Amino acid sequence: MLTYQDFLREATTDENKINFIQKAINQHINSDDYKKAVEAYEYYRQRNTAIMQYQKILYTVTGKPIEDVFSANHKTTSNFFYKIITQMIQYSLGNGLIFENENVKEKFTGDIDLKIKKIFRYAAIEKIAFGFYNNGNLECFKVTEFVPLWDEEDGSLKAGIRFWQIDSSKPLRATLFELDGYTEYIREKSQPMRILKDKQKYIKYKQTSEIYGTEIIEGENYPTFPIIPAYCSDKKQSMLEGIKEQIDAYDFIKSGFANDLDDATQIYWLLQNTGGMDDVDLAKFMQRLKTTKIANIDADEGGALTPYTVQVPYQSREVYLERLEKDIYNDAMALNVSGIQAGNITATQIKAAYEDINLRADAFEEQVLEFMQEVFELAGVENEKITFNRSKVVNTSEEIQTILSTGDLLPIEYKIKKILALLGDVDRTKEVFDMLKAESLAMMNQNVEPEEDNTEGEEA
């Protein structure tokens, strides 16, 4: 693992920087973090590597292993990891972040909520992700495309290398990010790596004129490094950790069950008084039986043909699969919605079912808040408060009735906000308040009676 101090020590010239960049990329690709990130993303795509790479083996009489190409080899993969990740992200971030100052989102380009979800989705999958803030834009760097250079003294991120190559026959692109700017590099096929663009500052000021068009006149950098690490919990690990083995066990048992059912669909025939038939004769006999569906048996000589089928035991497998599914959700602190979908469930029962996922969401949202505070520092946002509107399965009518039953104990503004959150319309809070204000003014105007005109007319 190379650090920021290694970079300062080795990258003293342009040539040394290029050598360091190539060495850092190669080491990163061969690191455990990179390999685990690749594996975790395969599980996220429902291409669970343990079962996909499994091959059934037979052993000869001498003990030599050979590949089993005769029996069924189904490979069924579960989708637990994708569901757990998606549930966590959508639960806390699905309705977007709620900023106390509504104008904060205007400081960012594009949909900031979508970008934050992407960053923390990859943080949950791969252990860590990186958010690059630059001039209002927030970009996600994944573990599989970014080499972090950590400071040995304080553990902070001081530099990094982003790299990408769409195909082995295409150029390798790399960008070196430092505190004082970034430099772009390229390595084309059969060519040494070279500088593509010299170091540039992060913040650029442009000037437009009729003669010269738009040109950059000056630039500056941020007070801190503009790439921020993001984690999904204080464990600082992929959410696959701890549940991978259970997912693998589920896949193996389910696939094994499918294989046994496939193999057991065969009908086995017991031939009696046919000891004179060798393997070739038996094969010919079975082929004729399958083709004509008729068999000639000399019963007088004691011959007989009896079919047999195998009943595959399934009760114990079903029980264990159900147990594994429950354990996976419990260990991931996720919500198994099958337990709250049946019947008319009360709000109290729903809240109890959400206990684990609420605890996990508390820890997750702490990481989001820490990340956003660093983003705000770069964006020049001060004293901003963030709240989360969690997406829940609720007994809406019961919750609204509870809010309304408080009477005058709670302010009307608070009750309206809570009801809008339950209805999923929290983003329309200002609009609703404006409508209520307009209606209130209209009613006041209607209640004001015009003054009577008591002026007496003049006599002619």
What are these regions (language model features)?
Residues 29, 33, 49, 62, ...:
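Hydrophobic alpha-helical segments and helix-packing faces
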Residues 4, 17, 21, 34, ...:
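Short amphipathic alpha-helical segments that mediate assembly, nucleic-acid/protein binding
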Residues 1-138, 452, 456-460:
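Extended, helix-rich architectural segments
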Residues 210-345:
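Extended, charged amphipathic alpha-helical segments
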Residues 120, 124-232:
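Extended, regular secondary-structure scaffolds
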Residues 283-286, 292, 296, 315-319, ...:
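C-terminal helix-loop subdomains that flank or include functional centers
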Residues 106-113, 236-247, 318, 362-365, ...:
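Generic detection of long, well-ordered alpha-helical segments
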Residues 82-93, 126-128, 244-259, 266, ...:
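Short, hydrophobic/amphipathic alpha-helical patches that form generic packing surfaces
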